[in-house]
Structure formats: C-alpha cells, structure tokens
Curated annotation (Swiss-Prot):
Major location category of this protein: Golgi
Lineage summary: Eukaryota, Metazoa, Chordata, Craniata, Vertebrata
Stretches assigned to the Cytoplasmic side: 1-11
Name of the featured protein: Beta-1,3-galactosyltransferase 6
GO BP terms: chondroitin sulfate proteoglycan biosynthetic process; dermatan sulfate proteoglycan biosynthetic process; glycosaminoglycan biosynthetic process; heparan sulfate proteoglycan biosynthetic process; protein glycosylation; proteoglycan biosynthetic process
Membrane-traversing stretches: 12-30
C-alpha cells in the first residue's frame, strides 16, 4: 500500500516522465524510419531510378562555371535522348567545407537537383580515387542502369553517339565492358602531383583507361562495390581502376574516339569524349553540333594517337602514328 500511496503522491511527475519517455521513443522510431528505405504502399522498397546510361561527372565544390557549361551543352535535356536513356549527377565532396560553400551548393541543388553530394569526403586530388569509388558505390546501390560514363567536368561527351554504339552491341559485348582510351606504358611517377610513392607492383602502371572519360558496364560497377573494402587506393583514380580490374575477366576496349589524355589531341568529328575543354570550347562544340551536325569547325590534330596493340607487352602497346584519330 505504501508503494501505491507514494505513486499517487508523485502521479504528476510520473505522468510527465511517461510522456517524455513515449515522446523520445517516437522520435527515435521516426529517425530510424527516415534513415532507412521508405517502403511503398505494397511493402516493397522505394523504386530505384532507371536509365540505360548513367553519367557521373566528377566536379569540385567551386566549379560552378564548368557545371553550368556542361548542363547547357552536352548534358542539356535535348542531348539526353528519350525517357530512361540517360541519368546524370555531378559528384562533389563536401567534407570540410565552410558554411558559405555548403549554402551555395544547397542553393545549386535546389535549382538543378543534379548534385551527388558526398559529405564524408573532402574534395581534393589526393582523395579522387576514394571519390570515384564512392560515386560508383552510390550509383550501384540506388540506380538501375546498364552502363556508366565517368567523366570530368572539363570533358565534352557525345551522348547521342555513345548511346548508339552501346545499343548496337550484341549481349556478349555488353558484359564486363571497360571502354576508353587505354595506356599500358605509363611509367610510375616518382614526384609531382601524380606521384605514386606506394606503387610496388612493377615499373609501369597496369593498363588503364585514361580518366577524362570512360565507360563501365553495370556488372563491373557492382563488382567494385562488393570488393571496395579490399581495394587499395592510389592517387590516380584511373590508374587505381585499371589495377582493380587487372585480374578480372573484363573486355578492355581501346577506342581512339576517346580523347581523354592529360591534354587534348585536338578536334575530330569522330570523337566521343574530348577532355580539357573550357566552357567556351564546350559552347562552340555545342553550337557546331546544333547548326552543322558536326563537332569541329575545323578538324585539327595536335598530337598523334595510337591503336593499342594487345598482342604486345604493355610497354610496347602504344605506338603513335599518323592516320589514327
């Protein structure tokens, strides 16, 4: 009876405590629901985005001008084909940003809705490999796609021509695809921005598609996501990707139409991706495509190209010669 009398005497405090406990529990449950997948009315998981070709553009927090140029040229709605042809995001690391930079990105996201913000990652060259792996992991978890084009925000891509090429492929040529402009004779850099102090495999990098733009099939992206905890990251994301896929049974397709080296080889109407383009270069190419149906006002070759010789050792793979785009 004493217990009941004490409980009655403190009934108000106990009641308030119970309400607080219930409120805390409800808030916790609401938070859990918001952090997980939201089920649909049928109890199934929320539908994933769908696209034949996903496009992930690596961009820096302050590169607004470049993103604007890409949005108004090769990633403009009229360049994306039909429904569910192309899905695109600009990937930006936001770790360590100040409040003003974060606010600017939030406003840009509110306006365009095409940013993939990575809060756990500080956007810097030394983190580029981790960034690309995070981009691909996010994509595999949230989008149903067949292929992904990874590009830089200073690259210009012909999505129409890329879509035509991919759709024309037989099923066997769509699986485990690693498509771009390959290098097999890249010497390990001992210093400078591209220094790889931890590289111990050999005196050359393993064959890799240059990072200005390349295409991967969805099955390889899925493999990378599942393996990510075991993958060693080097400074260069393209070198890292080539190394990660070296022991895998993939279809490596070297294509000179990917002008994706550290500087452009010029302008050729056959090019699918052209790297190292200024916003002005992109606008000029877009206008040429709209009014002339071709990429270049005048074709020009600034550097020789090559066809990769897969029958030769990697160090002898890539002999530049006339007549190759």
């Amino acid at each position: 009876m004493k217990v009941f009398r004490r409980a009655w005497r403190h009934r108000v405090a106990l009641g308030l405590g119970g309400l607080a406990f219930c409120g805390t529990t409800l808030l916790y449950l609401a938070r859990c629901a918001s952090e997980g997948e939201t089920p649909s009315a049928s109890g199934a998981a929320r539908p994933r985005a769908k696209a034949f070709l996903a496009v992930l553009v690596a961009s820096a927090p302050r590169a607004v001008e470049r993103r604007t140029a890409v949005r108004s040229t090769w990633l403009a709605p009229e360049r994306r084909g039909g429904p569910e042809d192309v899905w695109a995001r600009f990937a930006v690391g936001t770790g360590g940003l100040g409040s003003e930079e974060r606010r600017a990105l939030e406003l840009e996201q509110a306006q365009h809705g095409d940013l993939l913000l990575l809060p756990a990652l500080r956007d810097a060259y030394e983190n580029l490999t981790a960034k690309v792996l995070a981009m691909l992991t996010w994509l595999d978890e949230r989008v149903d796609f067949e292929f992904v084009l990874k590009a830089d925000d200073d690259s210009f891509a012909r999505l129409d021509a890329i879509l035509v090429d991919l759709r024309a492929r037989e099923p066997a040529r769509r699986r485990r695809l690693y498509w771009g402009f390959f290098s097999g004779r890249g010497r390990v850099k001992p210093g400078g921005r591209w220094r790889e102090a931890a590289w111990q495999l050999c005196d050359y990098y393993l064959p890799y598609a240059l990072g200005g733009g390349y295409v991967l099939s969805a099955d390889l992206v899925h493999y990378l996501r599942l393996s990510r905890e075991y993958l060693r990251a080097w400074h260069s994301e393209d070198v890292s990707l080539g190394t990660w896929l070296a022991p895998v049974d993939v279809q490596r397709e070297h294509d000179p139409r990917f002008d994706t080296e550290y500087k452009s080889r010029g302008c050729n109407n056959q090019y699918l991706v052209t790297h190292k383009q200024s916003p002005e270069d992109m606008l000029e190419k877009q206008q040429m495509l709209l009014h002339e149906g071709r990429l270049c006002k005048h074709e020009v070759q600034l550097r020789l190209s090559y066809v990769y010789d897969w029958s030769a050792p990697p160090s002898q793979c890539c002999q530049r010669k006339e007549g190759v785009p």
